[in-house]
């Protein structure tokens, strides 16, 4: 086979974020075959012409990512602080060019950091270790959730991972109503980016998405807890386990953290008073 045929082949699917390449199976190393692989590209968030952060992400729903990141990192207080947004190609990836209000941009410049993150790295941009786990306003206790509604949501979480279904390479974050219905979700190669996309989407949906909880397909790290709390999410469900720092942050900011979510199973780490199980 020619070398040119061994290179990455142009995407032939209709799903953004997937590309076909040639690969070899263990039981047949003589004959390459085509398979789908998830795309991962550098995405720079550029505020008022200044690059603030570079994250590795899936090249889809980037406006929601930029909005959610801006909210969960405290760069903005509400979507109204952003006057405009454009996604444009750059030499090695993509840029999300964000027009920020003067007041919020002045605050950003005071703590700006230039960095390049790993895939969805939640510590990226932290200048000092003391900045990790920064205080978050304690959440109110306005939400409740019936754990009997969780199983059906878990069965439908994969519906929001079309790239993941093809490649086995993405995380998902979805918004779950008190009824257990998943009304929207996003996926990404980075779990933090998937969550930021969801939080950005939620900020645009209004009252219909205010009641409910976040369900993620990944583990619950402290960054996932802190991002959720920064955006007013009171309940976070994770398919995998939580870390000790995630539990500490959740306890401190009054977030109900639930891990090991499988049909018929869930482990509640903090603030179980929001949950019922009839």
Swiss-Prot record:
Report any Pfam family annotated for this entry. FdhD-NarQ
**Which Gene Ontology terms of cellular component type are present?**
cytoplasm
The protein's UniProt keywords, in alphabetical order, are: Cytoplasm, Molybdenum cofactor biosynthesis
Biological process GO terms, please?
Mo-molybdopterin cofactor biosynthetic process
Indicate what this protein is called per its UniProt record: Sulfur carrier protein FdhD
**Annotated InterPro entries:** Cytidine_deaminase-like, FdhD
What residues does Mo-bis(molybdopterin guanine dinucleotide) bind to? 260-265
Keyword Transcription set for record: no
For whether the record's keyword set contains Chloroplast, the answer is no
Q: What function does the entry list? A: Required for formate dehydrogenase (FDH) activity. Acts as a sulfur carrier protein that transfers sulfur from IscS to the molybdenum cofactor prior to its insertion into FDH.
Instruction: Write out the GO MF terms.
Output: sulfur carrier activity; sulfurtransferase activity
Tell me the name of the encoding gene.
fdhD
Which locations, inside or outside the cell, does it occupy?
Cytoplasm
Family to which the UniProt record says this protein belongs:
Belongs to the FdhD family.
Which residues are the active-site ones? 121 (cysteine persulfide intermediate)
Domain of life of the native organism? Bacteria
